[in-house]
Structure formats: C-alpha cells, structure tokens
Amino acid sequence: MATKPQDANTTSREAITSKADSPPRPTALIFDSGVGGLSVYQEIRQLLPNLHYIYAFDNVAFPYGEKSGEFIVERVLEIVTAVQQSHPLAIVVIACNTASTVSLPALRERFAFPVVGVVPAIKPAVRLTRNGVVGLLATRATVHASYTLDLIARFATDCKIELLGSSELVEVAETKLHGGVVPLEVLKKILHPWLSMREPPDTIVLGCTHFPLLTEELAQVLPEGTRMVDSGAAIARRTAWLISSQENVISSQDENIAYCMALDEDTDALLPVLQSYGFPKLQKLPI
C-alpha cells in the first residue's frame, strides 16, 4: 500500500494517538532556546496531563546566553507570533531563564493570553540554606540581569550569594539529551570557583532550565549534601492556576507537536527523545 510522502519540513514517526481518540484540550506553548525547557514541561505535564502541548525551541539562535537582550526580545516575539498563527494558544511558558529576564514585558504587551516566565529560585534557596551561602548557577546573561540582581536584593539580604555563569554547561546538558556522555571533569572545571572555596554554597539555584537535566552528574561533583533548587514545580503550579482561571478557552484535538527553526541531522537524532516526552512529530516553524 502506498504511503503519504513526508513533508520536507516535518520529521515524524507513527502517531501515538489519533485525533479521534484525543479529547479537546487547551493549548500550551512551552518555549526555550534549546531542549532544557523539557524539564519545565515535565513538571507542568505532571499537574496538567490533558493539555495540548507545543514545544518550540530555537536551534538556529541557540544558545541565548551570549545574545543581546534586544535580539532575544525580537526573536521570541517572532517565534511566539508564528506559533499563534497556527494554534489557538491558551498560555505560553517561556521555559528559558535568559529569555524570561528580558522578554516578558514585550510578550505580555502584545498578547492577550497569559505568559509565564522562569526566574531563578532564589527565595526558596534562601530558606533552605544552612550555612548562609547560596550559589546561583546560570548563564552569564541571567547572572548579570537586573531582574536577577533585584531578586537577590529583595530576598537574600541575610545570605551570601555566589554567582557563577556558564554557557558551556548548557551545551553539556544538550549533549546529554542527545545521548552523549557527561564528563565529570568538565563539570569540575566549570564549578571550580565554588569547589575551591573554604566554605562553598550548600544550596545551589539551578538558574537555567537545562541544568535540572544534569542533577545526577552535578551531585557527583558538588560537596555531599549540597541541595539543588529549580523553579519547575512553582512554574507548573502557576500554569495550572492560570489555566483553571480562564473561561471560554479554545480547545484543540491535535496531537502534541514540537517545532524547531531548522531541520538537520541533529534534530533528526533528537526526534526519539522528543517522542519519549510525548511529541510524536517535529516540524520546522515557518518564520
């Protein structure tokens, strides 16, 4: 029997469910520069398993940690607008700390649907620390963002905050999700400023959504008993509340889908990973 030719802008395997089997669901867009936002998506899906999920990642401009704020704002607006033209969005989650620190005001000004951002979990980390030293591990853009410095000034006046910015760690997380090995020596080199301290942080804020993907490896390198905190669960609760507060939300019977900005060998290799997260199809977003 003949099979339908596959669109050049789409990568997929046999659909997990058909539209007829899927109940109507509000549509949630989860966006990140890379695949780190899948850690946030996991938390949201645990609370809201019946939403229609779209995952979009900017593999053309990745990583955002080294980009200017102006570029990031324009890029995120362009991508969210393109997704909105094809899907009735009920909510957007910017699952990228770097993008959240600069793009939320512009997104909320342009769109009527709620937009949720990810910010470093400094406040809960301050409550958890035992030695009064909290480490913020993030991209350099997030570490130096005025929003981050404001959070520290508001919630961490009684603690010592050690800042460590690393884009290399983002690349390491991407490599792991693509099936690569995480060399512990690389992590030790990245974390050396903390590991060499007489009294290192006992609580670490994972200030990039890629970093929860590396918690097992980080735990092998950091001092025993170090706590790691991220914003995933809090973002999931906020998303659930905003969804439940909406009325007359347009629902979708479409299956979950992932969008990238360019299809290549790397995205082909990533498809099985995305399918394991519940995204049977990966498609190039027309922008």
UniProtKB/Swiss-Prot annotation:
Substrate binds at residues 32-33, 64-65, 97-98, 209-210. The keyword Protein transport does not apply. The active site is at residues 96, 208. One of its GO terms (biological process) is cell wall organization. Keywords: Cell shape, Cell wall biogenesis/degradation, Isomerase, Peptidoglycan synthesis. Residues 1-25 are annotated as: Disordered. Pathway: Cell wall biogenesis; peptidoglycan biosynthesis. InterPro entries: Asp/Glu/hydantoin_racemase, Asp/Glu_race, Asp/Glu_racemase_AS_1, Asp/Glu_racemase_AS_2, Glu_race. SUPFAM superfamilies: Aspartate/glutamate racemase. It comes from the Bacteria. It catalyses: L-glutamate = D-glutamate. Provides the (R)-glutamate required for cell wall biosynthesis. Belongs to the aspartate/glutamate racemases family. This is Glutamate racemase.
